Amino acid sequence: METTMFKGSITALITPMNDDGSLDFSGFGRFVDWQVTEGSSGVVPVGTTGESPTLTHEEHARIVEYTVQVVAGRIPVIAGAGSNSTAEAVGMARHAKSVGADGVLVVAPYYNKPTQEGLYRHFMTVADATDLPLIIYNIPGRSVVDISVETMARMAQHARIVGVKDATANLLRPLQVRRAIRHKPFTQLSGEDGTVVSFLAAGGEGCISVTSNIAPRLCAELHRAWQDGRVADAMAIQDRLSAVHDALFCESNPGPVKYAASLLGLAGETCRLPLAPLAEDSRMRVREALTGAGLLN
């Protein structure tokens, strides 16, 4: 699949669970199909929002395979393949390739705090393992390490490293990356719903979104408006969803978005420990944001 397909509103999928914490595959299938029909430009299973840290390896693999089956080629599936073990990330990427995913999203290794050279070698090794396009996921708030612009430019020399999901919340970064990587197209996707229009203005091409779990049609329309040059329309949608973006991070992701999904009848709110149920004041904030945006009566 052409890497130019990795643009627009791409949903970082929640993983629906039953009350006992087991996976709700039937609910997940309906949810993924709804994402496609509502206009999402792509989906990312088993990322941060999909609770990858608390999934078993077998569950991770099943979710990726099932997502590919449900999507059935209608939009790109970018499989989460991140780990703080390079060998484990390679295994996830190879599995994603074997079941028909269109690309992989690989997070910067967390907890073990590699140097920039270690980061470079990690991503190059994963990129060498398959012929899938690889999107770097830079989220220093969770991984502690920040992939520098210089390191990213080195990585971009690899033909299969095609872009980045930037969750630094630093709006200088897309400008810096665009200047540093000029030898080929390099897709920059925002990892921050709240600043998405500003990110697009700085050269971004899309967003791997949490909010699109519950408002996929609006998120997709924002990106279509931007791509069509209807800046005022894109800003109007951003303004409408602004309080929702904020509320969905009032506690650790994906707790708030799963609660929002439960209010809308899309999925249950259950997360696996150590993520706890939302506090009552957080629940109120999410409800008020959804109501204010016209998503909940």
Curated annotation (Swiss-Prot):
SUPFAM superfamilies (UniProt xref): Aldolase
Enzyme Commission number(s) of this protein: 4.3.3.7
CDD domains, per database record: DHDPS (cd00950)
Record key words, sorted: Amino-acid biosynthesis, Cytoplasm, Diaminopimelate biosynthesis, Lyase, Lysine biosynthesis, Schiff base
Cellular component, GO annotation: cytosol
Active site residues of this protein: 137 (proton donor/acceptor), 165 (schiff-base intermediate with substrate)
Disulfide bond residue pairs: none
Gene Ontology MF annotations: 4-hydroxy-tetrahydrodipicolinate synthase activity
Localization: Cytoplasm
Binding residues annotated for pyruvate, in chain numbering: 49, 208
Pfam families: DHDPS (PF00701)
Protein's UniProt name: 4-hydroxy-tetrahydrodipicolinate synthase
Organism: Gluconacetobacter diazotrophicus (strain ATCC 49037 / DSM 5601 / CCUG 37298 / CIP 103539 / LMG 7603 / PAl5)
